[in-house]
Amino acid sequence: MAVLNQMSVLDMIKAFRRNWRAHCNSERTTLCGPDSMLLALQLSMAENNKQHHGEFTVCLSDVLLTWKYFLHEKLNLPIENMKVVDHYEDIRKTYDDFLKNSNTLDLIDVYKKCSIMTSNCEKHMISSIQLRDFLSGTECAVNDENNPHSPASPVKCSQNDKQVRLLAKKIFLSYLSLLVNSKNDLALAQILNTPDRGLGREAFTNLKHAAREKQLSMFLMATSFIRTLELGGKGYAPPPSDPLWAHVKGLSAFVNFIDKLNEILGEVPNPSLAGGRILSAIRTQLIKGHSSGEPFYKAVEEVVQDLNLRIKNIINSQEGVTVSATNISPVPPKSFAINHDTAYCGRDAVKILLVLLDEDAASAPTRNKAELLYNDQSTAPHGGASVLTLFRSPTQVKSTPVKPLRERIHTSLQAEKNKQMRQTLIRSQFACTYKDDCIMSKSKWNVNSSSKPLSALRLENDVSEGAQPSVGKARLETSSENVHVDRSKDDKGPRKSTKRKLAKSKQPGVREDIHCDQGDELYQPKNVKILKVPSDSHRKAGGKLAPGARGNRCTTKDKLIPGQTKLTRFFML
């Protein structure tokens, strides 16, 4: 019964291929078998969980429950008393978008399209219930229970060899599927790093996000990136920040190998010879680095022989149909083949590969769903990560961890200290005259400015400074004139003062009682009485000269910036 339904599914696919122009837009549209449908549904559920719960994962029980509901819902079968997971509509939409972007159709879509276009002579096509039983694997389970020849305890070694052979077959068919349909991301996920090209989960993640950003398939994104590097030149090269730069070597090897297969497909006119050369090229890549005694090497050899035989059988069967139907042209005219997805000489080989892939899509589903969906490196080192693990790879967010409070306070204090040190170091050559402790606060001016005139305010300030000179003022005069406390250097004061008096006597326009710049300070009236300063204020702070001991030069000086008058007098000499 299972074999009968499998043949019915294959007949349905053949009817679809005969009228492909009415069903799809491209001749190279590939079909998803039961296993590929289940994998696509799993990825859709994981994507939905990531959007709603933030984690790209899904448990096996939810996948099987949704798979059962999905088959009944899409085949328009009764779904009473059937459980369904949350957000099923979003899952279904994600599933349909994934197949559409991959240029693929599942068997249920093929069944619906063929049901609309089926003629009266083809009413013997498979029913919806039979297709449901075939996709769910119910018939296979019943057939195994009724088969008395199945061993009760299979040998472990033979089971491992069988798994390796199935893996090798999957790799070959994935290469052929990507060769026919370059948009098939599911096939690319299974062969991107087979054999090892250094394209692990990180490379797959970067390629996936780059493809989504530019709305391309993953293989077309990789091809575009490599072609830009090879043919675009420096002006068209991707930016250095592109994450694909780290995987240039592996992506270049993968794209060049697919180009080599496409060259064989387009240059060899004989479909049988072209198929054999393509399989031989894939075989050479897979067995590189393996000895002839390894199970994987033997499995690859067996798969190559089996696929070569199947290709020859397909060609022979098509030739027999062509001879029997003499009124149908075996090959469309050359003008029709132009601009139909491939060159004319390679179109026959593409048709043969499509038939080979359709036969695989009509094969029975895998009984062990857990091994199909969640098997990571079961046949290491050839199996690699599962499809869910590859698509789960998230974008790594570079976030700095939060530092402890003690460390943050220490960092801020250290930064403030360094800032103050930089401010004190960057000074001019006259920085000795700019002292923070000598600058008068603004509050002192604001309190008395409203009640007293400016001239009286200046006189009071001069008298107060002359009567009670501060230590800061003495320190200012000492630092500005480079005079130290020791008495040996204190004797040089009169010499400097006499030189300044001689210099002032040569300038008739400058008065002794007013030493200021007329552009910066107000003119002082002549009738202002200058208050005398006590003589005991001339010696303060260890014998230093007080400001009032300099011949009353600073008594009428306008208080601007300390040292400005001295600098002005220096440049007037």
Curated annotation (Swiss-Prot):
Keywords: Cytoplasm, DNA damage, DNA repair, DNA-binding, Nucleus
Bias-annotated ranges (Basic residues): 495-504
Compositional bias (Basic and acidic residues): 474-494
Designated name of the protein: PCNA-interacting partner
One GO CC term, this protein: nucleus
GO process annotations (BP): DNA repair; negative regulation of double-strand break repair via homologous recombination
Organism superkingdom: Eukaryota
Tissue spec. comment: Present in testis (at protein level). Expressed in testis, gastrointestinal tract (jejunum, ileum, and colon) and immune system (thymus and spleen). Weakly expressed in lung, kidney, pituitary gland and muscle.
Region spans: Disordered: 463-511
Additional information: The gene encoding Arom is located in the opposite strand of the gene encoding MCH.
Location(s) in or outside the cell: Cytoplasm; Nucleus
Keyword DNA repair: yes
Protein role: Required to suppress inappropriate homologous recombination, thereby playing a central role DNA repair and in the maintenance of genomic stability. Antagonizes homologous recombination by interfering with the formation of the RAD51-DNA homologous recombination structure. Positively regulate the poly(ADP-ribosyl)ation activity of PARP1; however such function may be indirect. Binds single-strand DNA and poly(A) homopolymers.
Family: Belongs to the PARI family.
Subunit relationships: Interacts with RAD51 and PCNA. Interacts with PARP1. Interacts with TASOR.
GO MF, one example: DNA binding
Cleavable signal peptide: none
